[in-house]
Amino acid sequence: MVLCFQDPDNIYSPKKTKKDDGERVITKQKSFLGLSILDISNPSSTTLSEDLSISLAGSDLHVFTQAELRVITQSFSSSNFLGEGGFGPVHKGFIDDKLRPGLKAQPVAVKLLDLDGLQGHREFMTEVMCLGKLKHPNLVKLIGYCCEEAHRLLVYEFMPRGSLESQLFRRCSLPLPWTTRLNIAYEAAKGLQFLHEAEKPIIYRDFKASNILLDSDYTAKLSDFGLAKDGPQGDDTHVSTRVMGTQGYAAPEYIMTGHLTAKSDVYSFGVVLLELLTGRKSVDIARSSRKETLVEWARPMLNDARKLGRIMDPRLEDQYSETGARKAATLAYQCLRYRPKTRPDISTVVSVLQDIKDYKDDIPIGIFTYTVPTKPRREVKETSLQNFDKPRRETKVTSLQNFDKTRREVKDTSLQNFDKTRREVKETSLQNFDKTRREVKETSLQNFDKPRNVSTTDNHQKFRSPAHTARNHRITLRNGYNSPMRNEAGGERY
């Protein structure tokens, strides 16, 4: 998604010229493609088609009519809908070899300008002029366009694999192998190098994963040049323009100042390279705040070989060159430096990626495989939940039935055993109590009767008081008997 971060007046101020008659002031600034912004900004200009024909003289672009494009896309059928970007909806079509002489039969992608979208007539013209004159294996091929009344359409070669974004982040897609990822990074850098080193350098300004398209062989090609700008000319170090781009990819100095340079594209390339390494989006609001922005989360670990494994895409399943991964991480770190002057230029990036791509010595031996469900994830999830819930309900009912049955059986058995035991205990207790009662009664009667046979004298002797003992002692002394007390004193009486 393209976002306009800011639009300060002091950043974008085209030259103003007055007409001789002083009737009105018009803004006029030469574009990198030869047409004036006055012409580009006026979609109802009657000379627009003529201007395009003159500017694109010698190019092989075809000018289609609205009727022809309806035939190609089957009236823009919903079954041919491919997606939608900042420019507008994109439909798949097929050009028959009978449609026009010299135009071979081929599948195409038709992009329709949404007049209420984020991009408009200016971006349409920039796209046509740029891709109409620039040809490179790593730039998507523009076959033709339609500029009829208010209709603005672009016809491209069809890219069967879609965008890098869909290949990396779509849930049902197969993971890209390590070598394929390096090739994509290398080819995308080659396309960017072609723009930066052109006779009139061009700054891409919107380098991101969704703008890198892949053909059937996974060859990477840059697309969507609507935001492209002329590079600085002469002694100029940058281009001042309103800030437009995609959140998570735009260079920090460009966001803050509106100063655009080729190093701004290098920063954006570093973000895409980081996405290839980690398998994560540049901005993912589903993650925690610390991990939401990819650059802020991963940059501290790019220069640490011990921590590099933490950020590598787990879907690679360790099927990658550790040496190559370290070099690629170092390159991404250099591209993401805060100061533009310290970032490498794109030619250096291409050279480093060439070396990394050719280095395959320590890639683990084996075929890269990744098992995915045959059904779409949503269907698999729903089926799994249904299957999971069905046994769960059956198990629950069966368990309740078995539990209730067992509970009744246990309850009946327990009551029977309890009642039986209770009766046995009661009978045994009564028998033991009666037996013990009789024994206690008999023993008590015997013991009660026995002490009554003891003599009274013995009892008196056994249980006499001190006064009684002293009286008996006096009687004994008087009668002349030896006294125990006297004996204790050591004497006898004769």
Curated annotation (Swiss-Prot):
Induction: Down-regulated during infection by Plasmodiophora brassicae. The modification Phosphothreonine is found at residues 65, 241, 246, 323, 383, 395, 398, 406, 413, 421, 428, 443, 456. Residues 76-356 form the Protein kinase domain. Disulfide bonds: none annotated. Its main location: membrane. Residues 462-471 have a biased composition (Basic residues). InterPro entries: Kinase-like_dom_sf, Plant_Ser_Thr_Prot_Kinase, Prot_kinase_dom, Ser-Thr/Tyr_kinase_cat_dom, Ser/Thr_kinase_AS. Keywords: ATP-binding, Cell membrane, Kinase, Lipoprotein, Membrane, Nucleotide-binding, Palmitate, Phosphoprotein, Plant defense, Serine/threonine-protein kinase, Transferase. Disruption phenotype: No visible phenotype under normal growth conditions. Mutant plants exhibit enhanced disease resistance after inoculation with virulent Pseudomonas syringae, elevated basal-level expression of the PR1 defense marker gene, enhanced reactive oxygen species (ROS) burst in response to perception of bacterial microbial patterns, and accelerated flagellin-induced activation of MAP kinases. Residues 434-471 are annotated as: Disordered. It holds the Pfam family PK_Tyr_Ser-Thr. Its EC number is 2.7.11.1. GO terms for biological process: defense response; negative regulation of immune response; protein phosphorylation. The modification Phosphotyrosine is found at residues 156, 254, 481. This is Serine/threonine-protein kinase PBL13. It comes from Arabidopsis thaliana (Mouse-ear cress).
